[in-house]
Curated annotation (Swiss-Prot):
Keywords: Biotin biosynthesis, Pyridoxal phosphate, Transferase. PROSITE patterns: AA_TRANSFER_CLASS_2 (PS00599). Pyridoxal 5'-phosphate binds at G99, Y100, S172, D197, D198, A199, H200, T228, M229, S230, K231. This is Putative 8-amino-7-oxononanoate synthase. One of its GO terms (molecular function) is 8-amino-7-oxononanoate synthase activity. It catalyses: 6-carboxyhexanoyl-[ACP] + L-alanine + H(+) = (8S)-8-amino-7-oxononanoate + holo-[ACP] + CO2. GO terms for biological process: biotin biosynthetic process. Pathway: Cofactor biosynthesis; biotin biosynthesis. Pfam families: Aminotran_1_2. The gene is bioF. Its EC number is 2.3.1.47. Its cofactor is pyridoxal 5'-phosphate. The keyword Ribonucleoprotein does not apply.
Length: 381
């Protein structure tokens, strides 16, 4: 019964061109393979100093953590938490096994029945799932639309206890930045708490410190910062930063923290070194220089209209997106095609991620191949 049901559902996905599958990424085996899909913005996943730190951590502490943080799995983890809190300028931080686990664990623990969540329409799936797991009422405001947000708050605020405004710092599919300065003012005015998922802002904006620093905003009692170590940091895991009471409460109530085996200590050692390198500033400066170069070249080839501040570029090709992505692979370029339900129908795009490892020639090759594919296969778009 289950097998036949799943077969029918999989067939439906294939018929609607929505079927997902795992593809072998040859970029590590083929030096002629251009990778524009990676979130390793600062190329720290292959940094020698970090790899040496990982080796040292493995030799010192062993392969795995062997337990959750509240049992046997608290090894060098508090050293990393101290480093992250120092880096972000907050009282405390807490690390989780992934960015997804962080959002789900933080939101479901803090947001309760009788509370109200206002969530941006384009927030990451992990935020959406965290909201679903909470007992709070959830309202969605139009993407970065402050008037719509204020309208929803004024119509609903008086009926609830705590107000939570939740947003990505940098939106993962479009690369745009949430107006945190305006969101902070709104949170202050309506006695709300602002939760920022800065997965794609940490290491990228604000001299590496993230989206909050980009707006010259300081951490405060009503701001909770969430991040990941799997993007610019180049490693694995997630973290949350905030005041002492928030972190202590999460240690006692956040289920994805309490019931997960902690990160391997070797990974923790690598992440500590990575934050040290990011704090020096050089990797982020190099990335911003490359973003400026990419802006220039992508504009020349009519692939973008406005300059980006982040390394995420959406090239919207709608229903032709997946075909273009397949043709790029045949041309030794890995650039992920993103389609519904990750993005709305009619907004299918190539999600181009640039890193410090890309050169001017790499950007030009990508543009030329895309335009050639469009010309040959689609007779232009």
């Amino acid at each position: 019964m289950l097998k036949s049901q799943l077969q029918q559902q999989l067939k439906k996905l294939k018929d609607n061109n929505l079927y997902r599958f795992l593809r072998k990424n040859n970029s590590y085996n083929n030096k002629n393979y251009l990778d524009f899909s990676s979130n390793d913005y600062l190329c720290l996943s292959t940094n020698k100093e970090i790899i040496d730190a990982i080796k040292e951590g493995g030799l010192k502490y062993g392969f795995g953590s062997t337990g959750s943080r509240l049992t046997a799995g608290d090894i060098n983890h508090q050293l990393l938490e101290h480093k992250i809190a120092e880096f972000k300028g907050t009282e405390r931080s807490l690390i989780y096994s992934s960015g997804y686990a962080t959002n789900v664990g933080v939101i479901s623990a803090l947001c309760k029945k009788g509370d109200l969540i206002l969530s941006d329409k384009l927030n990451h799936a992990s935020i959406i799932d965290g909201c679903k797991l909470s007992k709070s009422a959830v309202l969605i405001y139009n993407h970065c639309d402050m008037d719509n947000l204020i309208d929803l708050i004024e119509k609903n605020r008086s009926s609830y206890n705590n107000l939570f405004i939740i947003t990505d710092g940098v939106f993962s599919m479009d690369g745009d930045i949430a107006p945190l300065d305006k969101l902070k003012k709104i949170a202050d005015e309506y006695n709300g708490i602002l939760i920022i998922d800065d997965a794609h802002g940490t290491g990228v904006l604000g001299n590496g410190k993230g989206s909050l620093k980009h707006f010259n905003l300081k951490p405060s009692d009503n701001i909770i910062q969430i991040g990941t170590m799997s993007k610019a940091v180049g490693g694995l895991g997630g973290f949350v930063c905030g005041i002492e009471e928030v972190i202590e409460y999460l240690i006692n109530t956040s289920r994805s923290f309490i019931y997960s085996t902690s990160l391997p200590p070797s990974v923790v050692s690598g992440c500590i070194k990575s934050f040290e390198l990011i704090e020096e500033g050089a990797p982020t400066k190099k990335l911003q220089k490359n973003i400026g170069l990419a802006n220039k070249i992508f504009k020349e080839h009519n692939l973008i209209e406005e300059n980006n501040l982040t390394p995420i570029y959406p090239f919207i090709f709608k229903e032709k997106t997946m075909d273009i992505a397949e043709q790029l692979i045949k041309n030794n370029i890995f650039c992920v095609g993103i389609r519904y339900p990750t993005v709305p129908k009619g907004m299918e795009r190539l999600r181009v991620s640039i890193t410090v490892g890309h050169s001017e020639e790499d950007f030009r090759v990508l543009c030329e191949r895309i335009n050639l594919i469009i010309k040959k296969k689609f007779k232009g778009i």
